[in-house]
Amino acid sequence: MPNPNHDDSPIQNPMNRFFNLLFLLTTATTTAFAQADIQKKIQTDLIMADDGATIDLPAGTFVLASSLSLQDKKNITIRGAGADKTVLSFKNQSEGAEGLRVTNGQNIVIENLTIQDTKGDCIKTMNVNGITFRNVKVEWTGKPNQTNGSYGLYPVQCQNVTIESCTAVGASDAGIYVGQSKQIVVRNSVAYHNVAGIEIENSIGADVYDNHAYENTGGILVFDLPDLVQKKGGNVRVYNNLIENNNFDNFAPKGNIVAQVPAGTGVVVLATNQVEIFSNRIINNKSQGTAIISYFMTEEPIKDSLYYPYPSQISIHDNIYSRQLVPATYKGRMGMMYRFKLRFGKNVPDIIWDGIVDEKAPAAQSPICLKNNKNAQFANIDAGNNFKAISRDISKVTCELPPLATK
């Protein structure tokens, strides 16, 4: 028997479907306009902000189509409702590369928000004196892929940089990257599923401490590279960090310098001067707990006449090392080196030095000094002589350098 409360007519059901579809289309259109409105409002606030202003972003997930920018401002705070509450998604980005770009500023604070899935870098700041990232998450939400943006947090050519209580996930170069900058603090932050978790490059005066770098290709990198505006970095301290299980396959695009970092890397110092690595726990990084290498290991040509390609005054002390008895990676160029030249098998040393030295430097002082590193095995791999005289004698590099000055 037909239900008197239910209209089964052939006309009514199609009409219901029509109105339902119309409702959905209207809702979607309204949502799209709302997202466009929030993009316009945020960008307008960034443009119109007076020096000293705070720009508050509401809670919610907002899908933005183009980059946001702030320039030529002083004493500005950009504040979300919380890293898990204010989410700016650039998944369908059609204009620009960065999520947020800040240039030519002074005393800028970015805090309590998340930026996701940008075409390029999540947040880039350039020529800013006094930049603070606090409780910020930057991430690519899909599987790690070389099409992900290069950098999560990316201050470059900045001074007085503070990165604290931040999280970086999925960068195809470095999750937290500080380049060509001066006076830097990176602390209480987390980086995982990046090629490099944290990278300090061509920068002067950096403290990297109380961070957790795990499940990256390489945990913490301290690099000096040629052909950059700021030629020589140094005075970098890496301490009180947990650097563990950085065995993630390298997914950097070919040609990037970090594409050469082997999976299973805890810390790498490349051609940098005055680096102190101490009081860290460097655990289960299968290829190299800590590596100290010259730029010659990259086999890239050096065209910059002012570039110094050797590491020097590298102090590694009072760290705790531990690793499982597993082979190093056999992938990539470095993997081939492990397999056919070094042949460590499962007994991979925790600390590896390429052994390439500047013949013009004073012979009396080793460029690296190791002391009081618990459970640490060492190898000088004699890379400059085609690995002919690999030595695991740690006594030749057991020495002490003066502590670097605190900031």
Say what each PLM segment does.
Residues 259-263, 294-397:
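Long, ordered, amphipathic alpha-helical scaffolds
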Residues 16-24:
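Sec-dependent signal peptide recognition
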Residues 42-43, 65, 91-101, 117-124, ...:
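Extracellular beta-strand/beta-solenoid scaffold signature
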Residues 42-48, 63-72, 78, 89, ...:
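Short, T/G/N/S-enriched strand-turn elements that build extracellular solenoid repeat scaffolds
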Residues 50, 72-74, 83, 104-105, ...:
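Parallel beta-helix/beta-solenoid
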Residues 35-40, 72-119, 142:
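Right-handed parallel beta-helix/beta-spiral solenoid domain characteristic of secreted/periplasmic
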Residues 33-58:
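Acidic Gly/Asp/Thr-rich repetitive segments characteristic of extracellular carbohydrate-active
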